[in-house]
Amino acid sequence: MIKTVNIYDNPVLGVFATCTEDVAIVPIGTAGKAIDLLAEQLDVKVISTLINGSIVVGSLSKGNSNGFLISRDANVSDLKDVEVPVEVLPDMLTAVGNVILANDTAALVHPEMTDSSIEVISRVLGVDVHRGTIAGLGTVGMAGVVTNRGLLVHPMVTPDELSVLEDVFALPIELGTTNYGSQAVGSGLLANSKGYVAGSNTTGHELGRVEDALFFA
């Protein structure tokens, strides 16, 4: 069964798209084949839109089953078809999807995220929020992928970071890559508790690691 795809002829799915348990958000112009695959594998409604006029929807938004956040300067009308609350995150760290790693119970955010932004994240997503890094990177949304079942992270994650991740998410954690060695696993993978789709350059070995981490094996 095919579980890899490109968006805009590019395998960095997490930059262009994002997903929750209920929806996947993709940029306008995404090929019908990709939309159909996401709908089938993730068992979600697929919504096509632009965030602040941009196609990098995955970098500019982050959501879960409780709500969605979009980057400063965007408009909540960009996600008017999402059936949960949507709010703008008024933070200088504008690539919301890059700096928030979240599921339905917890979130890890860039260490420079402001207290006021953390309050917004907690309220909109309905989760406990913690600051941290993965492999020394504040872009935790690209350095990891978390569902309600498991967590896959950058292979250079440190023991101290793993300990924090275990405390925050209380989930099993695996290390891996996507797209033929990309350590920024969040850039090459969309996943929820029902399924996953990876970038087209992802190898069979990498897909196996994804399935182990997120309990699809």
From Swiss-Prot:
Signal peptide: none annotated. Gene3D superfamilies: L-arginine/glycine Amidinotransferase, Chain A. Pfam families: eIF-6. Keywords: Initiation factor, Protein biosynthesis. InterPro entries: eIF6 (IPR002769). One of its GO terms (biological process) is cytosolic ribosome assembly. GO terms for molecular function: ribosome binding; translation initiation factor activity. Coiled coil: none annotated. Belongs to the eIF-6 family. HAMAP family: eIF_6. Binds to the 50S ribosomal subunit and prevents its association with the 30S ribosomal subunit to form the 70S initiation complex. NCBIfam families: eIF-6, PRK04046.2-1. This is Translation initiation factor 6. It comes from Methanococcoides burtonii (strain DSM 6242 / NBRC 107633 / OCM 468 / ACE-M). The gene is eif6.
